[in-house]
Amino acid sequence: MSIFINADSKIIVQGMTGSEGTKHTRRMLASGSKVVGGVTPGKGGQSVEIDGHNLPVFNTVGEAMAATGANVSVVFVPPKFAKAAVIDAIDAAMPLIVVITEGIPVHDSASFYAYSLTKGTSRIIGPNCPGLISPGKSNVGIIPANITGAGPIGLVSKSGTLTYQMMFELRDIGFSTAVGIGGDPVVGTTHIDCLRAFQDDPETEAIVMIGEIGGDAEERAAAFIAEYVTKPVVGYVAGFTAPEGKTMGHAGAIVSGSSGTAQGKKDALEAAGVKVGQTPSETARLLRAIMGR
């Protein structure tokens, strides 16, 4: 099994006619994902030919869902148009909305996330995330499909590049699903959401959680793990050498005073029984030891 996506996921690409949308649609198709169309307001009725796939373009997500049966949307839309694109998907009751776009104003992200909660029909992953992959089943976003395989590990990460590294480090064991939740201050799906889903997934045997400095998401995840998660969890927290007050890569990755430090997050996770590596490679070794692999 997998979480959030599976072999039957039907994907539409919001912004498919743009350069990034086209490029990553091609890559998703090559990895076996079922991309069934795209959405670009004003270009409805057109089609896009990508590597032998003739993909229809629609004006709205609702039109695309009605015509294709799509149940996943991935958003490759410039930041200033992203809020409208996500609202369109929420209004259409799209079950899963994966927002890849980086640089969306925090107020816009908070607005569409709050709106999604009032509707109660859509899960948002992101923004500013690489998406998610269930190897051999579906790949939604920009995660390379050729760096790993299917297996019993669940991965949730704030960082795209660390997602890729961990998937490669553990490629011989493989993953049920890897989810990049994004590193912005406001995201639609949290570590806890993914931990809960992996705990409930019968084919996920162990979990890797990657966090980073800033905020208290990792501390809250640690409390959740202590109370709810019975499967083995290993972790890594990026940013041990980060200077105070400087944003490191992601908008949410910033240490303020004693709040949000890597050491504080590591301590909280270890208190919950999570083995935490000092490097991604050490984290992978910890998981191998737990799984006897």
Language-model-detected regions and their locations in the chain:
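Catalytic-core regions of core metabolic enzymes
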Residues: 1-293
